[in-house]
Amino acid sequence: MRLDKFLKETRIIKRRTIAQQLAKNGKIIRNNIALKPASEIRSGDELELFLRSRFLKIRVLSEKEYEVIEEKKIWGG
């Protein structure tokens, strides 16, 4: 499944266009590599997301499920 679609379907991010912008700006990382919006996501992947006011590290369980590994509030968005 595409990264932007996964983030929208799981409701981590409300709009697919916002997910695309985050990816284009290098705010979504897997294995120390910034992902593109069309990057394929598979179960077992660990993603790091730098959102406006928080850092989120998740593990993909399926196309519609994930588990939060780490979550931190950050300032300066």
Question: What residue spans do the PLM features occupy?
Answer:
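Strongly charged
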Residues: 2-5, 9, 16-77
